[in-house]
Amino acid sequence: SRRYLNKKLNFFKKLIISTDGYIALAGASTSKSIGVLNIGTGVVAHFMNKNKISQQLSGWGFPYGDKGGGWWIGLKMIQATLRAIDGYNNNGDIIIKKTLNIIGKKDLKILNWISKSESRKLAKLSKVFFSVKSKSFIHNSILKEGIYEIEMILKYMIEEKKIRKIFLLGSISKFYINYIKKKYL
């Protein structure tokens, strides 16, 4: 908490608390506008214009934000799997099979897995998601929704805020790069 930090770091004349994304951006920024889009467990973008005015996009965290990030992909996989178990989703889909192999195939085991899930645990499912070579309807649906969110962030940074140099970071960005429209790269 802020009070704890102030107590432990009270020997500084002035204490400024900021995000790691902002600090990385400030360190990398010269006199030009620059941005960073980090796609990992979550999704967060930071940009700074040439006047050193900065803004953060997304990064609201689990379970409310970071659409397109690893935890969100994992959640979408779980939701699709639960619908398949209930009988109104394609239970033969490769995503369903792979998800069931991880979370279990019996109701009690599934309930136990999801009751203990948190952002990092869900994000681990995204590795399975991106390892699927034979694409499926569910895979394509989740991927399309994630790409849309990533592109909306990039579009805002490029078209609205005129940020011309954006670095893609994070463990999942390397998978999205092949799907993002060229005009945003």
Predicted regions and their residues:
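Phosphate-binding/catalytic loop of phosphoryl-transfer enzymes
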Residues: 1-91
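ATP-binding/phosphotransfer module of carbohydrate and carboxylate kinases, centering on a glycine-rich
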Residues: 3-6, 28-33, 78-185
